[in-house]
Regions:
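Extracytoplasmic copper-binding redox domains, predominantly the cupredoxin/blue-copper superfamily
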Residues: 19-103
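Bacterial N-terminal signal peptides
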Residues: 9-16
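Bacterial N-terminal signal peptides that target proteins for export
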Residues: 1-9
Length: 103
């Protein structure tokens, strides 16, 4: 039986609304084992601006990513990816986003 582990990824926004022209795409890997331990996101902290996209990649199968209820900015859309599938999320609200891998 796999231990249920919650990994946190804070997507802090320090810049004013950046607009699509300067938008960046940031890749976050979902791993069984990484530099900081087991069942992790790498990187585990990302600084992004509104308009940026975060691309979650399940390097090891069996992972997903989903926002944590109550841990995303007010007015931001919650998101949930399928197991073993990539998910791209465009950030439209400034704030901190908490995410987890369900298994």
């Amino acid at each position: 039986m796999m231990k249920k582990t919650i990994a946190m990824l804070a997507l802090g926004t320090a810049m004013v609304f950046a607009g699509a022209a300067g938008a960046a795409e940031i890749e976050v890997k979902m791993l069984n084992k990484g530099e900081k331990g087991m069942m992790v996101f790498e990187p585990d902290f990302v600084r992004a601006a509104p308009g940026d996209t975060i691309h979650f990649v399940p390097v090891d199968k069996g992972h997903n990513v989903e926002s944590i209820q109550g841990m995303i900015p007010e007015g931001a859309q919650p998101f949930k990816g399928k197991f073993s599938e990539e998910l791209t999320v465009k950030l439209d609200k400034e704030g901190v986003y908490g995410v987890k891998c369900l298994p």
